[in-house]
Amino acid sequence: MELSGTSILLRVFTGEADHIGHMPVYECIIKAAREKNIAGATVLRGIMGFGASSVIHTARLIEISGDLPIVVEIVDTENKIEEFIPVIQQIFEQSKKGGLITTEKVNVLFYHPDK
């Protein structure tokens, strides 16, 4: 797969404790992205954040939170991202949890598999 020039960065904000059954929402998203042959995806774990509920989630040594902020970043062409957004929305519906989905244009400068 080749990816260069103008592409879309899709960000999905969720919580570490958000699951569908025993699988974390972020893992459901990553697996779905791989099944749809998305160019790439990364899960980032935040140290502090809040969302629509305004509840602050934090990682402190004294009180280790089990619900830290999670951001899934996905990059691919505009068409593939637009086709993938309903998949993410369905995952959120199944989890019965809230979240946030954003997109922005990015310029891919380098994207090559291992040799």
Regions flagged by a language model, labelled:
Residues M1-K115:
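Positively charged, small/polar-rich N-terminal and surface patches that mediate targeting and assembly
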